[in-house]
């Protein structure tokens, strides 16, 4: 009787759909549903082979947030985001179609990790936040966004910390625009990119040094799955980098093969945490042109030295020491909580999966024969 009873209950348990989105009331498309567009364009839907209008800001520019709704980014501290398969799994459930289905730190209640495109913790490839210091969203171009924070355990936790560089300058009147980006492992589902745009502002700024002009990131890390066991540091892009625009009909800045996607991790020199070398004075001796043959590896000036020489804005100050616990950037109250943890190599949530066998993966030609044609 018990198995039958449990099976009957399971029928009524709310299951979330796959895929992931950044959820906050500052985002574009916060209330977009499956019926809003002629096609399914919910914030969680992945982006692949789309026109520029369709993938840029997820085609949600006509669905802006309310004036005054911003995602706060505390300089020198972590900003806590909520990543989930469904708005109902977040503190914003009261405006979701299915009600409250929160389950602690689970980003996709009722679904296995394959629903958010990973075979397990060791298969995570990272996600990132980018910023453009422009309040008018219609003026922003893809090359205006700069990646300022990376979390290499994304997506694994619903509550995901993004460390904000201490030297981030204040936003102009009207605020900044930010976007969340994610590209998942090729070992779990078809390839796409994810982008959710939102309005944001820097709080507690103590610097007025602007960001450098971002450049296109280059593949330079160790890539044993594709026959490159060693990193090639000379081929890396150093300093400010653009997001990875990939696999669309137009607007791409990355052209990797469908089965060798770019990632927000060491493969493209996106280190875990705050990207502290994105400012115009980060490399006072310049950055050499990257290439596989380049032997000069630039070193950014020590942030502490720069901070001592940087005048603070006159409109306020902020302690440069990060707090012992994360700062929530959500204005909504939550019934769940969790302890702070490192963004990479953190505690692993049990999934009931078998331990990694240590067997080598198949080569890309063995594992998939599909090739994406641009």
Swiss-Prot record:
Q: List the GO terms this entry assigns under cellular component, sorted alphabetically.
A: extracellular region
Broad EC category: oxidoreductase
- Cofactor annotation remark: Binds 1 copper ion per subunit.
Record flagged with keyword Metal-binding: yes
Q: Principal place where this protein is found?
A: secreted
What's a Pfam family this protein contains? LPMO_AA14
According to the UniProt record, where is the region Disordered?
306-374
Q: What are the cysteine partners in each disulfide bond? A: 85-108, 127-154, 171-176, 178-200, 220-236
A GO molecular function term, named singly, is: monooxygenase activity
Compartments, record wording: Secreted
Q: Which residues are glycosylated?
A: 31, 49, 94, 151, 235, 315
Keyword list (alphabetical) reads: Copper, Disulfide bond, Glycoprotein, Metal-binding, Monooxygenase, Oxidoreductase, Secreted, Signal
Q: What is its EC number?
A: 1.14.99.-
| Chain intervals with Low complexity compositional bias | 313-344
Q: Where is the signal peptide?
A: 1-18
* UniProt cofactor(s): Cu(2+)
Query: What family is this protein classified in?
Result: Belongs to the polysaccharide monooxygenase AA14 family.
Q: What does this protein do?
A: Lytic polysaccharide monooxygenase (LPMO) that oxidatively cleaves xylan with both C1 and C4 regioselectivity and that specifically targets the protective shield made by heteroxylans that cover cellulose microfibrils in wood. Catalysis by LPMOs requires the reduction of the active-site copper from Cu(II) to Cu(I) by a reducing agent and H(2)O(2) or O(2) as a cosubstrate. Cleavage occurs only when xylans are bound to cellulose and not when they are in solution.
- This chain belongs to the protein called AA14 family lytic polysaccharide monooxygenase B
């Amino acid at each position: 009787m018990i198995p039958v009873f449990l099976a009957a209950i399971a029928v009524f348990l709310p299951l979330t759909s796959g895929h992931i989105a950044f959820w906050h009331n500052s985002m574009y498309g916060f209330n977009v549903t499956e019926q809003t567009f002629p096609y399914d364009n919910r914030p969680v839907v992945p982006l692949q082979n789309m026109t520029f209008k369709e993938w840029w800001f997820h085609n949600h520019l006509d669905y802006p947030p309310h004036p005054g709704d911003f995602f706060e980014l505390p300089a020198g501290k972590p900003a806590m985001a909520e990543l989930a398969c469904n708005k109902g799994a977040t503190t914003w459930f009261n405006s979701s179609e299915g009600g409250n289905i929160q389950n602690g730190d689970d980003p996709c209640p009722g679904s296995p990790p394959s629903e958010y495109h990973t075979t397990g913790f060791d298969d995570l490839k990272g996600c990132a936040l980018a910023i453009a210091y422009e309040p008018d969203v219609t003026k922003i171009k893809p090359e205006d966004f700069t990646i300022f924070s990376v979390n290499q355990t994304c997506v694994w936790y619903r509550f995901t910390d993004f460390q904000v560089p201490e030297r981030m300058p204040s936003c102009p009147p009207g605020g900044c625009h930010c976007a969340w980006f994610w590209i998942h492992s090729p070992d779990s589902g078809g390839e796409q990119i994810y982008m959710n745009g939102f309005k944001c502002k820097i709080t507690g700024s103590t610097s007025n040094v602007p960001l450098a002009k971002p450049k296109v990131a280059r593949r330079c890390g160790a890539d044993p799955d594709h026959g490159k066991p060693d990193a090639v540091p000379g081929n890396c892009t150093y300093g400010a980098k653009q997001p990875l625009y990939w696999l669309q009909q137009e607007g791409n800045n990355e052209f990797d093969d469908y089965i060798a996607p770019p990632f927000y991790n060491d493969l493209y020199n996106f280190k875990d945490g705050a990207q502290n070398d994105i400012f115009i004075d980060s490399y006072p001796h310049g950055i050499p042109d990257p290439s596989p043959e380049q032997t000069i590896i630039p070193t950014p000036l020590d942030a502490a030295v720069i901070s001592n020489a940087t005048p603070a804005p006159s409109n306020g100050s902020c302690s440069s020491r990060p707090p012992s616990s994360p700062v929530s950037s959500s204005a909504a109250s939550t019934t769940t909580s969790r302890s702070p943890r490192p963004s990479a190599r953190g505690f692993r949530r049990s999934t009931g999966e078998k331990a990694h066998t240590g067997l080598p993966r198949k080569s890309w030609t063995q594992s998939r024969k599909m090739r994406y044609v641009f």
